[in-house]
């Protein structure tokens, strides 16, 4: 089995609405899991840095513009098996993908989650409890737990 390493960046985006904090989650079109917006670094622009990729992915998959609140990302790693070639190619066979994702805490600026791209079938802002119940993958739940600590250090002093 082939092994492939992937590095992605994304955003865990919050929005203050009345006295509540809402968080952006997306349902992926392909695997139907609920996730935070993220994507490969440098797949659309050569020499793209982690922050640029994270902001771009939030806009593409989440339909919103956001700003990075904390320069230090949360890192999560996991492995998954891909049947065929990741991201389009024609080479078949199973591939083991070792994925590392860097998530930045971000604050919503503008836009509507309904304006997401084709990779996402749904995107919405929800309360913290719903995020915890809705996220599909352990790595995203772990990232959210870490981001909440960073969020609290910035906003609940």
Language-model segments: residues:
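Short aromatic/basic micro-patch
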Residues: 35, 98, 125
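Conserved N-terminal beta-strand and adjoining loop/helix that marks the start
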Residues: 1-23, 42
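Active-site segment of metal-dependent pyrophosphate-handling enzymes
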Residues: 63-112
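Conserved Nudix-box catalytic region and its N-terminal flanking loop in Nudix hydrolases
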Residues: 20-65
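Residue-level signal for short segments within beta-strands and strand-turn junctions
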Residues: 13-15, 27, 107-108
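Short, charged/polar surface micro-motifs in flexible loops or helix N-caps
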Residues: 18-19, 30-33, 42, 74, ...
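NUDIX/MutT-family hydrolases
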Residues: 102-107, 112-147
């Amino acid at each position: 089995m082939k092994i492939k390493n992937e590095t992605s960046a994304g955003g865990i985006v919050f929005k203050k609405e009345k006295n509540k904090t809402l968080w952006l989650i997306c349902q992926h079109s392909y695997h139907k899991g609920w996730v935070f917006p993220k994507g490969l670094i440098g797949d659309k622009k050569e020499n793209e840095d982690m922050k640029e990729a994270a902001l771009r992915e939030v806009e593409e998959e989440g339909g919103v513009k956001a700003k990075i609140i904390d320069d230090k990302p949360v890192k999560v790693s996991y492995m998954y098996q891909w049947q065929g070639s990741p991201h389009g190619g024609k080479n078949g066979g199973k591939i083991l993908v070792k994925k590392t994702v860097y998530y930045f805490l971000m604050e919503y600026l503008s836009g509507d989650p309904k304006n997401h791209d084709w990779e996402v079938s749904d995107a919405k802002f929800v309360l913290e409890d719903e995020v915890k119940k809705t996220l599909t993958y352990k790595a995203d739940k772990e990232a959210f737990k870490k981001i909440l600590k960073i969020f609290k250090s910035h906003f609940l002093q």
